[in-house]
Swiss-Prot record:
This is Imidazole glycerol phosphate synthase subunit HisH. NCBIfam families: IMP_synth_hisH (TIGR01855). The lineage of its organism: Bacteria, Pseudomonadati, Thermodesulfobacteriota, Desulfovibrionia, Desulfovibrionales. It comes from the Bacteria. Residues 1-212 form the Glutamine amidotransferase type-1 domain. It comes from Oleidesulfovibrio alaskensis (strain ATCC BAA-1058 / DSM 17464 / G20). The active site is at C79 (nucleophile), H187, E189. GO terms for molecular function: glutaminase activity; imidazoleglycerol-phosphate synthase activity; lyase activity.
Length: 213
């Protein structure tokens, strides 16, 4: 069973729909006991970093997430969830969770795309995600696969935590973390077959980790 974190800045329904489509048991919950009993946590997010942190803190879920990570529970952050797993976001000048060392920065609209035209901010659309190190999330996914992005800010973790990169005006980190602790800037639940495969890979990792305990 995967726990989808329930708070007011998350897009839980679309994540649940994707998991249901591929037969992965899941629950949308803010209950610390249910979260602790799950095999892994999905931490979605939409909107602004400041709002998301306010909602997490008000519900006491910031502490719950940190406790579960310290206990070794697998975690997958998505979009704003990915961003606020870092220490700080330029958006709303926000101190974030500090689960992974790094910051989140605004795209510079003066950057140019491959045609020489200024990039549009927010970045919206399909882009390749290039793994820079082996990662269980990408097992069985083609290097040519594209994922769906909607964001104005991008993660900038410490180099050791960069797992995959994407180019949009510049090369930026689109997946960061480490074994069992992952954050993806794109929306796997909206990314068709590659996104569903990534979610399936996360679930498989969670089950294996739970069985090993």
């Amino acid at each position: 069973m995967l726990a989808i974190l329930k708070y007011k800045a998350g897009n839980q329904t679309s994540v649940r729909r994707a998991l249901n489509h591929i037969g992965i048991p899941n629950v949308i919950t803010a209950d610390p006991a249910e979260i602790a009993a799950s095999e892994g946590i999905i931490f979605p997010g939409v909107g602004a970093a400041g709002q998301a942190m306010d909602e997490l803190t008000a519900a006491g879920l910031d502490a719950v997430l940190k406790e579960q990570v310290e206990a070794g529970k697998p975690l997958l952050g998505i979009c704003v969830g990915c961003q606020i797993m870092l220490d700080y976001s330029q958006e709303n000048d926000t101190r974030t969770l500090g689960i992974i060392p790094g910051e989140c920065h605004l795209f510079n609209p003066a950057l140019e795309d491959e045609t020489g035209a200024p990039i549009r901010v927010p970045h919206m659309g399909w882009n390749r995600v290039i793994p820079r190190k082996p990662c269980a999330l990408f097992k069985g996914i083609s290097d040519d696969a594209e994922f769906y992005f909607v964001h104005s800010y991008f993660p900038n973790p410490q180099p050791d935590y960069v797992i995959a990169t994407t180019t949009y005006g510049k090369e930026f980190c689109s997946v960061h973390g480490g074994p069992g602790l992952w954050a993806v800037q794109f929306h796997p639940e909206k990314s068709g077959r590659p996104g569903l495969k990534l979610l399936s890979n996360f679930h498989a990792y969670c089950k294996e980790a739970a069985n090993a305990q």
